[in-house]
């Protein structure tokens, strides 16, 4: 996915050279957290039967963002005429899989246990391979532009669901 995204980014940057009076914004988002889609349904599938389970070793960083913050960030970027270029839309505090699962389990009263990888793969399919990757992403440019997140970390994001 990242390779495809980078190829698209290069294409947009080429277009920007042809249209110098046009403001281009590329928003890279983390996994959205809300009740209906994004990362939440995957976590719900993995944590069936009242058991919380992490994916991978639990130390990998997972870029997440509350859907409300993501929507506000896009609005901010499109309405602030000084914003252009590439922006990461992720929570300002990096979250590990362990932190996400702990917050999820604590919020929904689940017991944390290890679940065998084949069972998790059966529940979520190929999404497991994406969630096993370590991806440390911060929204530095977005914050420096003046954007303020309502939900800053995994606990705040998941508690708001």
Q: Residue spans of the language-model regions?
A:
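Residue-level signal for the nucleotide or nucleotide-sugar donor/cofactor binding architecture
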Residues: 34, 62-68, 95, 137, ...
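Hydrophobic "lid"/C-terminal helical patch
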Residues: 74-78, 104, 158-161
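Alpha-helical membrane-targeting segments
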Residues: 42-63, 106-136
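Non-catalytic, hydrophobic alpha-helical segments
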Residues: 70, 74, 89, 100, ...
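Mid/C-terminal beta-alpha module of Rossmann-like enzyme folds, strongest
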Residues: 80-126
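Alpha-helical substrate-binding/gating segment
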Residues: 44-53, 59-89, 94
């Amino acid at each position: 996915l990242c390779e495809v995204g980078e190829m698209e980014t290069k294409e947009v940057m080429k277009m920007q050279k042809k249209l110098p009076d046009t403001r281009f914004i590329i928003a890279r988002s983390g996994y959205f957290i809300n009740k209906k889609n994004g990362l939440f349904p995957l976590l719900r599938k993995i944590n069936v039967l009242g058991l919380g389970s992490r994916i991978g070793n639990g130390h990998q960083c997972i870029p997440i963002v509350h859907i409300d913050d993501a929507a506000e960030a896009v609005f901010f970027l499109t309405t602030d005429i000084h914003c252009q270029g590439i922006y990461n839309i992720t929570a300002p505090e990096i979250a590990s899989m362990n932190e996400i699962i702990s917050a999820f389990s604590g919020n929904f009263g689940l017991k944390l246990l290890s679940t065998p990888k084949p069972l998790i793969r059966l529940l979520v399919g190929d999404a497991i391979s994406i969630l096993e990757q370590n991806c440390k992403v911060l929204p530095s440019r977005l914050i420096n532009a003046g954007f303020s997140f309502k939900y800053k970390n995994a606990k705040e994001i998941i508690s708001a669901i």
